[in-house]
A protein has these predicted regions:
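Active-site beta-strand/loop architecture of penicillin-binding DD-peptidases
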Residues: 42, 88-91, 242
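Well-ordered alpha-helical segments within folded domains of soluble proteins
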Residues: 107-115, 169-170, 249-254
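Membrane-proximal, proline-rich intrinsically disordered regions
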Residues: 22-76, 81
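Short, flexible, mixed-charge acidic loops at enzyme active sites
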Residues: 159-173, 218-220
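Conserved, well-structured interaction surfaces
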Residues: 81-158, 176-192, 199-206
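Bacterial Sec-dependent N-terminal signal peptides
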Residues: 1-33
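Aromatic-residue-lined binding/catalytic grooves and analogous aromatic/hydrophobic interfacial grooves
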Residues: 23-26, 162, 195-217, 221-224, ...
Length: 257
């Protein structure tokens, strides 16, 4: 009898206990979890940097292309080889082993969005450090955009009606209301935009990422030294921890191609 009484008591207490331990946002997200528009988004610099990180992940130089089998130079013995399937009738818009458009064009979308968000995001409390972060991240974006434009032209430029065409040039962030049915710009226009972006990257970025020693303040570029930037803050932005990111030397190599 006592056991039955205990069970009944627990059954009556459970709903009351649930009211004390349940989350008030179990069914409606808490306000702080809802990011409404650019104003909320830019307050989280790591989220803004994720736009740039997406482009680094899609880096067209990060993988080897074994496309010899897409020509008569080689043939695969593997039945499921994508190039072999392509040659035997499986090539379509939804199954294209040669596709580079999606990743290259998609990364430019992210880079354009980053350019809008970078100046609005609080990267540092010190004004000069904030300026350095904005310049570095913007320079990376311009350099990456030049790189992706280069590979878009390599893969998708061509002749049409006797004219050498490139790809549509899109420099602004896109929304669901943007015009996506854009004509291709000429190859020359795309080339000029590539050079323009590469030049901006060269202007904004350093040749290489190195940590300055405490007695090397004289190596801080005059632009930042004039703003009172010290070695510690300079290394925070331009130090060796960013060695694998876009720099002026890489931008020059892109421009040279």
């Amino acid at each position: 009898m006592k056991k039955i009484f205990k069970i009944a008591t627990l059954a009556l207490m459970m709903p009351a206990m649930a009211t004390f331990v349940s989350c008030d946002d179990a069914f409606e997200p808490a306000i702080e979890n809802i990011k409404d528009g650019v104003e909320d988004f830019v307050m989280y610099p790591s989220w803004v940097e994720a736009y740039i990180a997406h482009a680094y992940i899609s880096n067209p130089l990060d993988e080897l292309s074994f496309n010899d089998m897409a020509t008569d130079d080689a043939v695969s013995n593997e039945p499921g080889n994508s190039y072999r399937s392509m040659a035997t009738g499986s090539w379509s818009a939804s199954n294209n082993p040669m596709d580079r458009w999606r990743d290259l064009r998609g990364s430019i979308v992210y880079l354009n969005g980053a350019l809008e968000l970078i100046p609005q995001s609080p990267w540092a409390s010190i004004e000069s450090t904030q300026e350095m972060f904005v310049e570095r991240f913007s320079g990376e974006v311009y350099g990456l955009r030049a790189l992706f434009m280069l590979h878009l032209l390599k893969n998708h430029a061509g002749m049409a009606n006797g004219q050498l065409l490139g790809v549509p040039i899109v420099l602004d962030p896109e929304t669901p209301k943007s015009e996506f049915n854009l004509p291709r710009n000429t190859f020359k226009e795309c080339y000029d935009q590539l050079i323009k972006d590469a030049d901006k990257a060269i202007e904004m970025l350093t040749e290489e990422a190195v940590d300055l020693k405490d007695n090397e303040a004289h190596l801080i570029p005059a632009k930042w030294a004039a703003k009172g930037v010290e070695v510690g803050e300079y290394n925070r932005v331009w130090g060796a921890h960013i060695v694998n990111r876009m720099n002026a030397r890489v931008a020059k190599a892109i421009k040279a191609q």
